[in-house]
Amino acid sequence: MSTAREQPIFSTRAHVFQIDPATKRNWIPAGKHALTVSYFYDATRNVYRIISIGGAKAIINSTVTPNMTFTKTSQKFGQWADSRANTVYGLGFASEQHLTQFAEKFQEVKEAARLAREKSQDGGELTSPALGLASHQVPPSPLVSANGPGEEKLFRSQSADAPGPTERERLKKMLSEGSVGEVQWEAEFFALQDSNNKLAGALREANAAAAQWRQQLEAQRAEAERLRQRVAELEAQAASEVTPTGEKEGLGQGQSLEQLEALVQTKDQEIQTLKSQTGGPREALEAAEREETQQKVQDLETRNAELEHQLRAMERSLEEARAERERARAEVGRAAQLLDVSLFELSELREGLARLAEAAP
């Protein structure tokens, strides 16, 4: 394969569909995810191709010819018929802009294919494989659902001088438009289902986060209660500190007042000595411990307040997520109802059109 063919002229991402070969009416998706769709120039055969690879096989390998026509059937869906492959391809894009870019590039490539055919018939050679087409890569973007109808006879290319549509072609066109509406409703329904699944996942994550915050809050509250009890114990211990007092020994009536005074002075000295040795450091240590514990309690209370604030915020987010999920469910329900109505109307329309087609000469 040449270098010119290996480098795409233009690439984008889209959901790929093919017309059902049995019914020629319904679309068959090529996969659940969007695929890369590219324009290539085959220098060996001097042709332009639209190629899309899914896994190990080519989903699209369509040679662009001058008589092909790319038709926009909705804001995000387009299609073209490939007579060589005997099928109709449909592409669903993420936005109308992507569809417009692909359609414009289709026109450029078709014109380049026409010039290539003319030069080939004249015996000339093309010096530029892209005929002035600038390479352009469209960055991938998340795909929304796309849709389109299909009856191969309705998608054949038409030249500018083609005659106006006959009555039979007009009926077929009406039937094709009905199929467009059906596929559009189905695509919107699938898009709403995806949105609902995403909201459900976000709700589960929010519930898990809220449960985790509640566990942390309970642990912080238990720690704060334990520290409060410790502070109360230390305060009670400080209030009930036993002050050493001198024991009064039984004195006989024969002891003199001087001996009693000397004994009292001796005990006072012992008390002062004990206070200087043990009382001061212990009180200072207990005061420091109480101050540190109180600081921890204040820090924990501040942290608890922050956690409670965060918990309230998480609960508000949870309620918003639940409300959003309910809205999504309501939208899905409305879409399902509208789809049922549209399918019923489409069925009646098909029956009427079938009767008209049978009655037409």
Curated annotation (Swiss-Prot):
Primary localization: cytoplasm
Function: Postsynaptic density scaffolding protein. Binds and cross-links cytoplasmic regions of GRM1, GRM5, ITPR1, DNM3, RYR1, RYR2, SHANK1 and SHANK3. By physically linking GRM1 and GRM5 with ER-associated ITPR1 receptors, it aids the coupling of surface receptors to intracellular calcium release. Isoforms can be differently regulated and may play an important role in maintaining the plasticity at glutamatergic synapses. Negatively regulates T cell activation by inhibiting the calcineurin-NFAT pathway.
InterPro entries: Homer, Homer_EVH1, PH-like_dom_sf, WH1/EVH1_dom
Region described as Disordered: 114-169
Organism: Homo sapiens
Protein name: Homer protein homolog 3
Outcome, altering residue 52 to A: Does not affect interaction with NFATC2. Attenuates inhibition by AKT
Domain WH1: 1-113
Localization in the cell: Cytoplasm; Postsynaptic density; Synapse
Domain notes: The WH1 domain interacts with the PPXXF motif in GRM1, GRM5, RYR1, RYR2, ITPR1, SHANK 1 and SHANK3.
Subunit structure: Tetramer. Isoform 1 and isoform 2 encode coiled-coil structures that mediate homo- and heteromultimerization. Interacts with NFATC2; interaction is calcium independent; interaction competes with PPP3CA for NFATC2 binding; interaction is reduced by AKT activation. Interacts with NFATC1 and NFATC4. Interacts with SHANK1; forms a high-order complex at least composed of SHANK1 and HOMER3; the complex formation is regulated by CAMK2A-mediated phosphorylation.
SUPFAM superfamilies: PH domain-like
GO cellular component, as recorded: basal part of cell; cytoplasm; cytosol; dendrite; glutamatergic synapse; plasma membrane; postsynaptic density
One GO BP annotation of this record: regulation of store-operated calcium entry
